[in-house]
Structures are given as C-alpha cells and as structure tokens.
Design a protein with these regions (language model features):
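Residues that define the transmembrane beta-barrel architecture of outer-membrane proteins
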Residues: 81, 107-113, 163-168, 208-212, ...
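Outer-membrane beta-barrel "beta-signal"
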Residues: 33, 467-480
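Surface-exposed loop and membrane-interface regions of Gram-negative outer-membrane beta-barrel proteins
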Residues: 93-113, 121-171, 176-180, 184, ...
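Repeated loop/turn-to-beta-strand initiation elements of outer-membrane beta-barrel proteins
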Residues: 85, 125-129, 179-184, 222-227, ...
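Extracellular/periplasmic loop regions
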Residues: 144-157, 311-410, 460
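N-terminal periplasmic/intermembrane-space "pro-region" immediately following the signal or transit peptide
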Residues: 2-108, 114-124, 343-346, 351
C-alpha cells in the first residue's frame, strides 16, 4: 500500500507542477559521442518513447464551429486519438556471488520482470504530454535475493531491483521551430546528458532513475546547443520501497539542483561540451552528496581511411562541496580514451581518474569525487564495486575489444585495473564480457558476466580486501 500511496502522491505533485509550469521542459537528448570502452551495452536501457507526428483537426468538428468548439471537440480529441502507446518488457535473471565478504554467506538469485507502459499525445500547437507507469515483479520467492536492503535478506548480496509499482514519467512538453529552435518540458521525466557519467537515468536497473524537473533547450545558432534544468526531486532506482531503512543512502533525493550543459558541434571531428552541475541533494542519510561540478570535454571520431575509424575523448572536471554539505573539499576528474574501429573489430584503451581531496569539514580525512546522479553501471566495471567512490579516489586503467560475429552478434570484452588516486592502494582488477543479439525490430537478448578480484585494499562497498565478486545476467527485452 505504501508504494501505491507514494505513486498517488507523485501523481498529485507532478500534476500540480505541470499545471503551474505548462510552458517549459527538457527535450529528448540528442545522442552524444559515447565512450566506447565504458558505454552501456546496446539496447539494455529502454529508449525514451518516440513522439507521435502532428495530426489535423478531427473530422467531427463542424466546419462552421466556433474556435473554442473546434479546439475542445476536434483538436484535443484528435491529439489524444493520434498519440502513441509505448510498451517495454524486460525479463532478467541476475545472480551475485561475493566470496570473503561479510556478512554475505549466501548467493543472490533475482529473476525479475519489468513492464513499462506509457502513452504520449500527438503534438497540439507544439504541446505534448506523457504518462508512463512501471511494474517490477519477482518470479519466484523474494527471499532468494537481497532487494537493496528492503526485504530483510542481509545474508545475501544486494541486487538493486526491488519489486514495485509506480509512476515513472508524467510530463508536459512544448517544442517550437520558429525563429530559434526551442523545447521545454516540466514534470517527472528522463534526463540523460552526454555519456551519462554525471546525469543519467540508470537504465541498467529495472526501475530507471527519473527527475522531477523543469528545463529548456535552445539552439540560438547552428551547432550551438544550450540546456538548463532545475530539479526538485530525484526518483531513484530503489523507489523508496517498503522496508528500505529511513537512513538508507539509496532513498530518493530531495533536490534544489541546477543542470547546465552547453555543446558546440561545428567541428567535423567532434563535439566540444562544457557543463556545470550544481547538486543540492538530501535524503535520510544527510547532505553529503551535494556537490558542484564544473568541466568539459572534446570527443569525436575521424576516419584514417575507408576501413579504419579512430575515436577519442579528453575530459576534465573539478568539484567542490555545495549547499548544505558539511564536508569541505576539492577534487578533480579526468578521462582520456583512444580507440580504433576496423570492422568487424573495435579496440581501445582508457584512463579515468576520480580524484580525492583533503576534507577540512565534518568527518575529516579525505573525500572522493562524487557522481550521485550518474548512470553508474557502465563505468568502472560491471560488477559495480565502485558505485560508491573511494575516499582516496580511484584510478581506472581499462582496455576493451569488441568483435561482431556473423548475424550481427557483438561480443565485448573489457579489462579494468584499479588503484587509489591518493596513496599506494591496489583495489584489484576486473574482467567483463557481454554478448547480445537483436531479433527483428522489437526483440533483444543479452548475456553479461563480470568477475572482480580484490587486492590489498578494500573498496568502499567491501568489508575486506581480496574479495572475489562474480555477477551474471541473462535478459530478454521487448520494445514497442
């Protein structure tokens, strides 16, 4: 009943926000240059619903009707009738085995099915609306896995897919192409910026992360894109489900955050992007995730000849505490990646550093670079050992290779080696492999495996060094 109540409250709050701010929003993100070595496996994150094409006035509106009658009895019903339904169903099995990790004495086995169903109206004078709900059900006994700490299975390692039913999108949008292209959106929505390293919908999990926000995007001149959003609530993947402790760091965030992103794509060899993410976040665990991050990157690809394509990325950012965060620190981030695509093979290497800074505020010691609103699964290993970044920072050296087998079956291999950024700690290494196959227009099948081997220093999520974590996933997904 609590989930239903939470869903009802979100409908009321979101609906009010939509009425008060009907003229603003965030448009669907254009596809960015992705990091080939760390990008999320294809077709695993459900796509945002496509927007239906505009339609004419409903035939039932009489030709001589007054404008109000045409609007209410013709154009509004027409926009509803010519809208688009979307359906996504993902059946997934996840198994987690953590050796030498206290207090886990058993494995987790999580067979779940996620059903997402929504509807988007056709455009009406530039306006559109969307409603979408999600249900996550467990196929079998719920006590076979630790549902993110919400079901009392503390002897099993956590799997971030608790069962729930909730509203996950409810927004009103506006788009105009007159003079200066402009789009806006208000309400509960997906927001994916760039490669989702800082802001994303965490689409790997069965319940995606959404944002209660109002924002806009404008293109004042060709190839220059300006984006701003104000976020007042973050609906995280755990959904504040029953049983989740009140002080859990996994609960939804109350927010007073500003997202700013500026991109320029006139260069044929890539895109230049600058950003500022001012995150004022709090939940039952406190305000320690509040941070201000400023940075930018250049990423793109260039042909060497008609058979070889080189891709590259260079990014730098710095971060300080923000708003009510009691910590006082400053930390840097940088990422360099170089790859080559020689069909049907792609190879590459990268170096990502999430720095660390001395803390002169509450808690003392050091504070690591934070990414609390990121889509975390694609980065620093699929075993998700470093979802919580170490206080001493993290250096991730990775290599990847992908080969596309006959029948368009990509197989990806990634190797990670981890070190502390401050000090001489060795966090271990990880091997990842993934194979996927699309069947027709609507179906995708995926199998993924991650094997983490700890060394002399324990990662933040671990209770001891030399922990071995193995995770396995098998999924079938239908998108319509």
């Amino acid at each position: 009943m609590s989930n239903i109540s939470n869903c009802h409250n979100k409908i009321v709050l979101t609906g009010g926000a939509m009425v008060l701010a009907v003229t603003a929003s965030v448009f669907a993100q254009e596809k960015p240059f992705m990091q080939a070595g760390t990008s999320q496996p294809p077709s695993l994150s459900p796509p945002q619903a496509t927007e239906p094409a505009a339609t004419g006035t409903n035939a039932v509106a009489a030709a001589d009707a007054n404008p109000l009658e045409k609007f209410l009895n013709g154009e509004v019903p027409d926009a509803i009738a010519h809208g688009k339904f979307n359906l996504n169903v993902r059946l997934r099995y996840e198994q987690v085995d953590e050796d030498n990790q206290t207090p886990y004495t058993k494995n987790s086995y999580a067979p779940t099915v996620r059903t997402r169903f929504g509807y988007t109206t056709a455009p009406l004078y530039g306006f559109q609306g969307m409603l979408e709900g999600v249900n996550i059900s467990v196929l079998g006994p719920e006590h076979n896995y630790n549902a993110a700490g919400s079901n009392g299975q503390g002897a099993r390692p956590p799997v971030g897919d608790p069962p729930m039913t909730r509203l996950d999108q409810a927004w009103l949008g506006y788009t105009s192409t007159n003079y200066v292209p402009f789009s806006a959106k208000v309400g509960q929505q997906q927001i994916n910026l760039d490669n989702q390293r800082f802001i994303g919908d965490a689409g790997w999990r069965q319940n995606m992360q959404t944002f209660d926000a109002i924002g806009a995007r404008v293109t004042p001149v060709k190839d220059l894109n300006l984006y701003y959003s104000y976020v007042w609530d973050v609906n995280r993947v755990y959904g504040d489900v029953d049983g989740l402790p009140a002080a859990s760091p996994n609960r939804d965030f109350d927010s007073r955050s500003h997202l700013i992103n500026v991109s320029y794509a006139a260069c044929p060899y890539g895109r230049l992007v600058g950003y500022a993410y001012l995150l004022d976040l709090s939940n039952g665990a406190g305000n320690a995730n509040s941070c201000a991050t400023y940075g930018g990157y250049f990423a793109g690809a260039a042909p060497v000849n008609d058979k070889v394509m080189v891709d590259y990325r260079a990014e730098f950012a710095w971060q300080d505490q923000y708003a009510d965060n009691p910590q006082r620190y400053s930390a840097d981030y940088y990422n360099f990646e170089l790859g080559a695509n020689i069909k049907p093979i792609a190879i590459g290497t990268g170096y990502e550093v999430l720095g660390s800074g001395a803390n002169s505020g509450a808690g003392g010691e050091r504070v690591g670079f934070k990414t609390p609103l990121a889509s975390l699964h694609p980065f620093n290993g699929w075993a998700e050992v470093f979802i919580t970044h170490p206080n001493n920072g993290l250096q991730d050296i990775y290599e990847y290779a992908q080969v596309t087998l006959p029948e368009q079956i990509p197989v990806r291999f990634i190797y990670h080696k981890y070190y502390a950024d401050s000090g001489s700690g060795n966090y271990g290494q990880e091997f990842d492999v993934m194979i996927s196959k699309k069947f027709g227009k609507y179906w995708n099948v995926m199998v993924e495996f991650a094997d983490y081997l700890g060394e002399n220093v324990a990662a933040p999520a671990l209770t001891a060094p030399k922990v071995n974590i193995q995770k396995f996933w098998a999924a079938v997904e239908f998108n319509f």
